[in-house]
Amino acid sequence: MKILGIESSCDETAAAVVEDGSILHSNVIVSQIDIHSHYGGVVPEVAARSHIEAINPVITEALEKANCTWDDIDAIAVTYAPGLIGSLLVGTLAARTLAILHNKPLFPIHHVEAHVYANFVTGTTESNSSLVFPSKQPEFPMLSLIVSGGHSQLVLFHNHGDYDLLGQTQDDAVGEAYDKVAKIIGLPYPGGPSIAKAAVLGDPKKYLFPKAKLQNPYDFSFSGLKTAVLRSVQAAVGKDYTFPSHELPALLNEAMRNDFAASFQQIANETLVDKAVKAFDDYQPASVVIAGGVAANQDLRKQLKERLPIDIEYAPMQLCTDNAAMIGTLGYYYAQKMAPADPYTLEVVPSLSMTKTAWNKQEHKI
């Protein structure tokens, strides 16, 4: 079964063709990072306009690279939640139109849940691909640490669509904290890669930042860590809280910037690993997967390898950040259990918890 996946929830326009929830035939991504880096973050209106320009060419290219016509496509899967409303509308409108035009079943996909399913792709038919895939699909029960710019969650999957949300961020997601700290210390957007690069040259023990203590041992909080970095930067350059934060980077030298990056990254990743290790000890899953853009962080991978008594096989870097391969992959599993959506009435949902999409429950139809 070949699924055309379409993703446009934030600032990547993507389309992919995935077969049987595991084999990647094409994966096309148009990123807007260069556009939004001028603003220090994603501008929703700019993102939506860029999606409008890219969506049709991206879908066409994905089909061409997969050597597929519409007769070869069995269904369409598209991100409908969560995300920026304007961005979501572009992708879903394209998917709805194509589903009607070509008479294809349409499956609405939850973006955060889909990140987990990037780990289910085990191969590709693209001859020139340099991607390295996991040797096998994860086994259930599966513990998933989902870490991205908008989400930080620990989820225990019992089976496809059957999962429990163990914990989540109570304020900033870890990827959001990376972006904000990068801005504080004068590193470019996006903050994840910038901080990781600077941290290699810094001392992770130079500044000791706190870890949040929460009632739920699996929940996350990064707003306090972000504030602690801000206060430490102010102290390091001899300024108090009244000094404009946007002027702080000019007062830092490169060594200070690297040390702040390394110290922040150390504690942020330690926090993630602490929660993952506790959940592993408590639930003893058969496999562990890391999903989302922050999964590409090499220090996070290193800490997990040192502290978890189980090997983790990672999705390729290109499938950690936003992509449509994960949408098409999850779409296949949706198609096994769920009725397709009505393309005439499907609406986007900018804010939607994974707990509202427990699709293993047959009474819940999207």
Descriptions of predicted regions:
Residues 2-72, 78-82, 115:
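N-terminal beta-alpha supersecondary unit
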Residues 13-19, 144-146, 152-156:
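Short beta-strand scaffold segments in enzyme catalytic cores
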Residues 78-81, 98, 148, 289-297:
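Glycine-rich beta-strand-to-loop/alpha-helix junction loops that act as flexible
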Residues 108-109, 288, 304-327:
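Conserved phosphate-binding/catalytic loops in two-lobed NTP-binding clefts
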Residues 109-142, 330:
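Conserved phosphate-binding catalytic cores of ATP/NTP-utilizing and phosphoryl-transfer enzymes
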Residues 115-118, 316-356:
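Glycine-rich phosphate-binding/hydrolytic loop that grips phosphoryl groups
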Residues 158-203, 226-234:
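Glycine-rich phosphate-binding loop plus the immediately following alpha-helix
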Residues 197-288, 297-306, 335-338, 356-366:
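A contiguous, well-structured pocket-lining segment that forms one wall/lid of small-molecule binding clefts
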